[in-house]
Amino acid sequence: QHVRDSIAAANEAAYLAQLEIEREQAVADSLAAIGEMALDSARLEKTYGYFAAAGVGVEEQFAVENEKIRLTFSNKGGRVCAAEMKNYTRYDSLPLMLFADGDASLGFTLFTSDNRIISTKSLYFEPIVSKTDEAQIVTMRLAVDADAHIDFIYTIPNDDFMTSMEIKAHNMAQYLSPNTSSLDMQWQSLIRQNEKGRKFESRYATLNYKFVSDDMERLSELRNDSEKLAGKVRWVAFK
């Protein structure tokens, strides 16, 4: 009996020692996690300043469509990441995509009052979808606090190909540089091959643009061409 009692006592002591080791490890893991979170928070604050809360998130996509087009939005960058023409197909009967995720990128440069330069492409927006009798409205909101934000507002008419976009700032004066009177835009897009003959498609591909006060101009359709625009343009389009 004495031997059995000694073995039981030894087993209990070992069990209690193991529990203490596991408790200490759990405390150490918790402290490490807290430290890592604090470090991540400090990194976000250093990089994004006022926009630190929008610097972390999970990319999510959702689609909005009317009778003619289907647009896919991403909360990362607050942008349209894919556009499909309904009721039309490519030469091989696949859906006619103007661009798909990975083909295009859109971002705006923000100059903040705390001397940071931030691109909206890396920030996470809150999507707000609403409807009127004439259109669906997708508002992608970039919030600084509960009462200060920048909205990217997309209006998709019920029966039209054209989608409008406008940018509205609400109570952002103290967060943006006082010299901010416009936003620099970065737009890149790969032109997809939707026709069977690549040579034919390349022959007629071109880019059109219109200055604010001048007529429309275009790059050459028949040769490689480029142009650096110095003035403001009202719109840019390609085919």
PLM features: what roles do these ranges have?
Residues 45, 52-239:
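Soluble non-transmembrane domains of integral membrane proteins
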Residues 1-2, 239:
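Accessible peptide chain termini
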Residues 2-38:
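Long, low-complexity, compositionally biased polyampholytic IDRs enriched for Lys/Glu and Gln/Arg
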